[in-house]
């Protein structure tokens, strides 16, 4: 018997075409619409350009950067302490591309209307390709408001922070055109409670803003430890203060900044997170002594905003993969995406994704208008609301998207496992869920006008009885202050859903807004795929499914 004729056992059929090389912007109708709606129409060309990069070379680099994790090298071969973290070349490609396209700098260097929205849109695309590199990009972007509080230091650092040049060399910033910045706040004993920090700062000479100090202590989490400098917190005689700590001293020698080890994390694998010690590390005070938290808080707010954008991006990429798979997969002789139950699931996932995007880009518009009192109050509240709600929704949503793909969504050849492992970090980083909800209560009770700004934003329901009823119930919830901390999560969720519904209803696709309001403001669904009857789910699925050229 001649078995050679049977060497080819089967033909590969019923598999979706590859998405490799697709322009992530051009297949994303919601992003195209909302980025223009919120003021970034002038930037569509550069967003489109980044969409091609994100779906092509950056997507490929993302797989390599996560397969080849950063490695800590404490000493060189001669025994000298060097404290290096070595990255795969793909990581540097991700960083270089993002910095050259202005992801950490655009709103600061070109502060025209819509700049924050444009930058958030490109960050949204970048994070779909690879999210871990977003950490140093975000911290560099977010450091600018804090640096500006100390003009003498800003004069040295800001031109390099805002430069569109990436230089990963471990050398003093005087020899670099571009730098990145990190942040190190939490300690073993306190975590989020940074006022419990024990790291001490001792003046080298004169005391106060802009002066040099030596820091003695540790930080339990320091992400991107190969950054050129770090904003950090330490205690002085007047309390917790903010400092800029460079990797190198002015004479070019190593600063007393020692990496202890890299964290072995659930996800976020391309990004190095570390434990560090300061053993007399030279640093310069930023802002008023004893006012470290207020000084660094705007940086924290910006990083929380990027958590919203990042989680929205993870959900969008999961939806892209699931909807594309189901659009090209036959089950029982019928296209999976055209079968009623799968349409219910995919439409529900699409609602979650677009609602996350619209709230994130609405926040971007608020950041574009910092001198507008309403926008400033909106930003103060919704940074915490959105960070809580969007980041909280991502893990379950991505899990459901993977399930739509069956085993194909569970194997590491797919991007879904990486998205799923990545999703929890944004809920935890810069304050976990309870921290955000307590911040919502703080903003509403301590800062004048924030509650009024919320209800001014929500309006009267925009002609929709269901939204009007939700707003009325929300108002009643705030008149009852009993056990308000106990109810903080429910209140924050209700604010988020009300804002998402309002934004979708006010300017969005009517099929999407009707389905969102009908499923989120009414009913009590616990899992995806339980949308009520009577909705145009086919149109919602079509809106979210990549259209291949």
Residue map of PLM features:
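A glycine-rich, basic-preceded beta-loop-alpha segment at the flavin cofactor/substrate interface
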Residues: 251, 260, 275-303, 320-337, ...
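A short core secondary-structure module
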Residues: 210-256
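C-terminal helix-coil-helix/basic helical segment that borders enzyme active sites and/or dimer interfaces
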Residues: 354-387, 402-403, 475-488, 492
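Internal helix-loop-helix
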Residues: 80-172, 223-224, 422, 429, ...
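Conserved phosphate/anionic-ligand binding catalytic regions in large, soluble enzymes, centered on
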Residues: 130-145, 308-311, 315, 392, ...
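Flexible glycine/proline-rich, aromatic-decorated loop/lid segments
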Residues: 266-297, 404-435, 444, 451, ...
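Extended, charge-enriched "interface" segments that sit outside catalytic cores
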Residues: 1-112, 548-549
């Amino acid at each position: 018997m001649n078995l050679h004729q049977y060497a080819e056992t089967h033909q590969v059929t019923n598999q979706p075409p590859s998405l490799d090389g697709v322009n992530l912007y051009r297949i994303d109708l919601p992003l195209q619409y909302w980025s223009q709606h919120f003021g970034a129409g002038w930037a569509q060309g550069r967003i489109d350009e980044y969409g091609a990069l994100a779906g092509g070379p950056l997507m490929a680099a993302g797989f390599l950067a996560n397969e080849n994790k950063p490695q800590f090298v404490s000493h060189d071969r001669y025994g000298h302490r060097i404290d290096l973290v070595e990255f795969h070349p793909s990581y540097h490609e991700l960083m270089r591309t993002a910095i050259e396209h202005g992801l950490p700098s655009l709103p600061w260097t070109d502060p025209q209307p819509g700049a924050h929205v444009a930058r958030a849109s490109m960050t949204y695309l970048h994070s779909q390709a690879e999210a871990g590199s977003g950490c140093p990009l975000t911290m560099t972007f977010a450091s600018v408001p804090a640096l500006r509080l100390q003009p003498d230091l800003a004069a040295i650092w800001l031109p390099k922070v805002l430069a569109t040049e990436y230089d990963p060399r471990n050398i003093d910033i005087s020899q670099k055109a571009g730098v990145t910045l990190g942040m190190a706040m939490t300690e073993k004993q306190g975590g989020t409670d940074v006022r419990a920090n024990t790291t001490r700062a001792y003046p080298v000479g004169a005391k106060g803003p802009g002066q040099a100090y030596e820091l003695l202590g540790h930080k339990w989490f320091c992400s991107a430890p190969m950054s050129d400098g770090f904003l950090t917190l330490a205690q002085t005689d007047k309390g917790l203060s903010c400092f800029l700590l460079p990797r190198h001293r002015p004479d070019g020698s190593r600063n007393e900044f020692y990496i202890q080890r890299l964290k072995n994390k659930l996800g976020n694998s391309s990004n190095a997170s570390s434990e560090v010690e300061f053993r007399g590390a030279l640093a310069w005070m930023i802002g008023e002594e004893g006012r470290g938290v207020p000084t660094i808080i705007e940086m924290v707010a910006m990083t929380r905003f990027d958590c919203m954008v990042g989680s929205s991006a993870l959900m969008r990429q999961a939806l892209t993969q699931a909807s594309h798979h189901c659009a090209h997969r036959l089950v029982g002789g019928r296209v999976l995406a055209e079968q009623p139950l799968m349409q219910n699931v995919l439409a529900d996932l699409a609602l979650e994704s677009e609602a996350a995007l619209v709230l994130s880009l609405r926040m971007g518009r608020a950041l574009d208008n910092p001198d507008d009192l309403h926008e400033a109050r909106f930003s103060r509240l919704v940074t915490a609301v959105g960070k809580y709600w969007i980041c909280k929704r991502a893990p379950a949503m991505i899990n459901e998207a993977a399930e739509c793909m069956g085993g194909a969504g569970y194997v590491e050849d797919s991007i879904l496992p990486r998205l799923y492992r990545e999703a929890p970090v944004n809920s935890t980083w810069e304050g976990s869920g309870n921290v955000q909800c307590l911040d919502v209560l703080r903003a509403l009770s301590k800062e004048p006008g924030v509650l009024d700004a919320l209800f001014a934003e929500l309006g009267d329901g925009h002609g929709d009885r269901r939204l009007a009823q939700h707003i009325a119930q929300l108002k009643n919830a705030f008149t009852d202050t009993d056990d308000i901390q106990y109810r903080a999560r429910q209140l924050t969720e209700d604010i988020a859903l009300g804002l998402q519904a309002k934004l979708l209803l006010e300017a969005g696709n009517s099929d999407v807004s009707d389905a969102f309001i009908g499923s989120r403001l009414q009913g009590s669904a616990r899992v995806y795929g339980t949308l009520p009857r009577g909705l145009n789910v086919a149109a919602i699925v079509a809106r979210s499914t990549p259209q291949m050229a």
